[in-house]
């Protein structure tokens, strides 16, 4: 379990004070994958660096597995950091060392005997899918392979928490998915708690159980990924979801001709089993109305499926529209009116 209580990080310069993290409270379940998303400057990198005390909070508490990180002795903090390890956007590999020796490096620092360190490193090479590349140098590896080395190295001391600082930002989409699949596999095999920060909703949707959205140092929205994706509340969250959906339909609305009286354009959001139900056809039949599908999209999250439909209803009375809306609520389908004639 990881808890952040009223965590603040303030930087003082000659001319001003910058509040990078502003009274953040989070609770992260052991064994879960927790995502923190935000645009550049939101404070997410500063936040994650306080988990292992690479940055000390100005105030507030960071508690991991019952240990108050800021209250640990130097030796206690050193030991804790071996259990709260980190992977980085730009890999941070030692270019003069081979794959195997990069992975052995933290074991050497920890004083693990060479034979045991080599055996552990070989096991990790296999775990991350680099068997046969043990003697290669970082300059001979692709970006995805370098990140696999970074992950293996971070796992060398058997951590309980893995921190991922924009770990896929430098990778192409296919390699990103491969690294995300690897993180899922590692979490399942080693029961790790993974905390990752990103500016890509795709990453959050793909592997995270829960998400926190940051803006200007504050957590502005948080909760289970499917719930946040299905029903984003804050403008920033809505923007991330739209970008993931490649949804610019609301912009296109301004180019449409005015709707006739009693016509509607609505967006429906489905989750779980409702994504496979023939809701549109059944409602069309029930209310004897014509429904045009203007846009459709389905996205998979780690814990379920979310579907989106934009519909044009040329005519429906206000009474029937009220019944239509009520039936959607009963079917656990969310509706947003985009335009009304």
From Swiss-Prot:
It is a peripheral membrane protein. Its EC number is 7.4.2.11. It is found in: Cell membrane. Its main location: membrane. One of its GO terms (molecular function) is ATP binding. It catalyses: L-methionine(out) + ATP + H2O = L-methionine(in) + ADP + phosphate + H(+); D-methionine(out) + ATP + H2O = D-methionine(in) + ADP + phosphate + H(+). SMART domains: AAA, NIL. The keyword Translocase applies. GO terms for cellular component: plasma membrane. It comes from the Bacteria. The complex is composed of two ATP-binding proteins (MetN), two transmembrane proteins (MetI) and a solute-binding protein (MetQ). This is Methionine import ATP-binding protein MetN 2. It comes from Staphylococcus aureus (strain Mu50 / ATCC 700699).
